[in-house]
Amino acid sequence: YVATRTRFDKVNKIDGNNHLILLCKNETGYKNLAKLVSAAFIEGFYSKPRVDKQLLEQYHEGLICLSACLAGEIPQAILSGDYERAKASALWYRDLFGEGNYYIELQDHGLEEDNIVLPQLIKLARETGIPMAATNDSHYLRKEDAKMQAILLCIQTGKTMQDADRMEFQTDEFYVKTTDEMYDLFAMVPDACANTQIIADQCNFDFEFGNTKIPYYKAPGGMDNQAFFEK
């Protein structure tokens, strides 16, 4: 999550957050992502762990950034009717992460908000030259699993399927779609689907397993660590 203002601002009903997707290209990206996550929990936690743009400026190397779902900064600006702010935000992220490392994320789950945001995102991408990436917000594996997801949400939130105010997804499109389904859904921008393979090809970080790396902590007063623990 990215803080509305800074990660240190924590005022009720003012300091919310926006979604953002960060992917590791290499070891540098992984280390920077780890630093961002740590700071989000230690310094920026306010309902959710949050980074801010200052941290992104400091730890963006080796990362690929996607503009995220409807809860992202740019879609939210579009939904509020401020296209110019959305465009300015997109250009800020593009300039920060660099050419080829920032993508306008396109999603279409048949929601009313998608009908508003999607055309504007495509327009923005074409005006700025920022590449697009088509994704799907997948919360379950198959389309027919939508009902099971609804039941699980009721269990999580203490509601029943009969409750009118229960949390629910408005469509059954939040599943893992096939390649053909995605190309059909985004037939007007096939490059947005093709770009997902380009992104995957850039993510080349391999975890090193079997080599435990425990942080070193120096005991106070020059004491030996074991002696300090025994004390």
Listing of model-derived features with the role each one plays in the protein:
Residues 1-231:
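Phosphodiester-processing cores and adjacent nucleic acid-binding clamps
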